[in-house]
């Protein structure tokens, strides 16, 4: 939502922002597909055509589960401007990413490591080329 948009607008030219959601709740990716190349100003006027509530959102990464992505318009604008895309990951990818992330010594939650899940081979997004540099934000602390 707003955090992703702020991060994206703060990136230098040449960087792209990809957002990550899970198969159990991906309203942003669905809105992205439905919106296509619709003008940014139109997105707000036609909100209900593109951003519709997700039925029964569920995931181990529960901190990114919303029935709607409320700041989605800004996310779409940043992804379009930067050449990024929404990525949808499986629950297996969320679990594997969390296990990998914990090995860094950072007390990260499944939600906080969802960005790493977007880099795993099962992700729906663009693959990372050899030598390409990426940044991932671990944005949630595990409290369990």
Name each region found by the language model.
Residues 1, 110:
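Residues that form or flank phosphate/diphosphate-binding pockets in enzymes
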Residues 2-6, 28, 115-122:
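Buried hydrophobic packing segments
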Residues 8-108:
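Active-site/ligand-binding loops adjacent to catalytic centers
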Residues 36-44, 48-61, 78, 113-144:
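Phosphate-binding loop/pocket of nucleotide- and phosphate-handling active sites
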């Amino acid at each position: 939502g707003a955090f992703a948009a702020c991060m994206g607008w703060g990136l230098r030219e040449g960087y792209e922002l990809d957002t990550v959601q899970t198969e159990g709740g991906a309203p942003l990716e669905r809105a992205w597909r439905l919106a296509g190349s619709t003008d940014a100003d139109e997105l707000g006027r036609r909100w209900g055509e593109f951003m519709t509530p997700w039925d029964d959102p569920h995931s181990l990464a529960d901190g990114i589960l919303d029935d709607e992505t409320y700041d989605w318009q800004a996310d779409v604008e940043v992804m379009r401007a930067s050449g990024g895309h929404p990525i949808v990951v499986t629950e297996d990818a969320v679990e594997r990413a969390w296990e990998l992330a914990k090995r860094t010594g950072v007390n990260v939650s499944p939600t906080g490591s969802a960005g790493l899940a977007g880099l795993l081979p099962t992700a729906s997004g663009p693959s990372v080329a050899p030598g390409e540099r990426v940044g991932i934000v671990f944005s949630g602390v595990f409290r369990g």
